[in-house]
Amino acid sequence: MVYHSQFNDESAGFRLVGNVPILPLKTTHKGPAPKGDANSVDIIDEALDLFKANILFRNFEVQGNGDRVLIYLTLYITKCLLKIAPMNKADAEKALFLIAQEQFSIPGESAFPLGGLVTVPNTRDAADTLRQYFTQLRLELGVRLCQRVYAVDPSKANKWWICFSKRKFLNKAL
């Protein structure tokens, strides 16, 4: 059974850009996401917690807007794990920072892999907000992923994380 996001409740009042909710984050990185409560689980914690279970599935029925962010983060985790597999923690942190900052596609651009799941932002400002939000997510996820993958030994990646790096989620990649 696939695990879905706890942020699917549309009555929670999260701001939407297209059909992507701008969810609160526990982060120091600047961006459009509101500050999250330090004691609660945010979407990045949720994506990391559910990654190993969800990566095993080829199908994912979207039950709400929070699932769209969860799918994007799951694909991004896979990309990150492929990149950091042979690295130590310091090199991995640098590599993930660079990956987060590189140019990437957003909904409405031809290279965006989730074109059918995520609607195109209706204005240029909305597209810029979405790009900033995805960048903020990518930066914070890189930091937290390194904390988990290198928790035991900073000189090498944990094999129980890296073994999932070659799996394809929804047969897509970022």
UniProtKB/Swiss-Prot annotation:
- Indicate the secretion signal residues: none
Say if the entry is tagged with keyword rRNA processing. no
Among the GO molecular function terms of this UniProt record, one is:
actin filament binding
Entry's localization field: Cytoplasm, Cytoskeleton; Cytoplasm, Cytosol; Cytoplasm, Cell cortex; Cell projection, Pseudopodium
* Listed GO biological process terms: actin filament polymerization; actin nucleation; Arp2/3 complex-mediated actin nucleation; exocytosis; phagocytosis; regulation of actin filament polymerization
> What domain of life is recorded for the organism?
Eukaryota
Coarse class of the protein's main subcellular location: cytoplasm
A cellular component term, taken from the record's GO annotations: pseudopodium
Q: What is said about its interaction partners and assembly?
A: Component of the Arp2/3 complex composed of arpB/Arp2, arpC/Arp3, arcA/p41-arc, arcB/p34-arc, arcC/p21-arc, arcD/p20-arc and arcE/p16-arc. Interacts with carmil (via the region between the LRR domain and COOH-terminal proline-rich domain); carmil is required for Arp2/3-dependent actin nucleation. Arp2/3 complex, MyoB, MyoC, and the alpha and beta subunits of capping protein all form a larger complex with carmil.
> Which protein family is it in?
Belongs to the ARPC3 family.
Say what the protein does.
Answer: Functions as a component of the Arp2/3 complex which is involved in regulation of actin polymerization and together with an activating nucleation-promoting factor (NPF) mediates the formation of branched actin networks. Seems to contact the pointed end of the daughter actin filament. The Arp2/3 complex is involved in organizing the actin system in cell motility and chemotaxis, in phagocytosis and macropinocytosis, at late steps of endosome processing, and in mitosis.
Descriptive protein name: Actin-related protein 2/3 complex subunit 3
List the source organism.
Dictyostelium discoideum (Social amoeba)
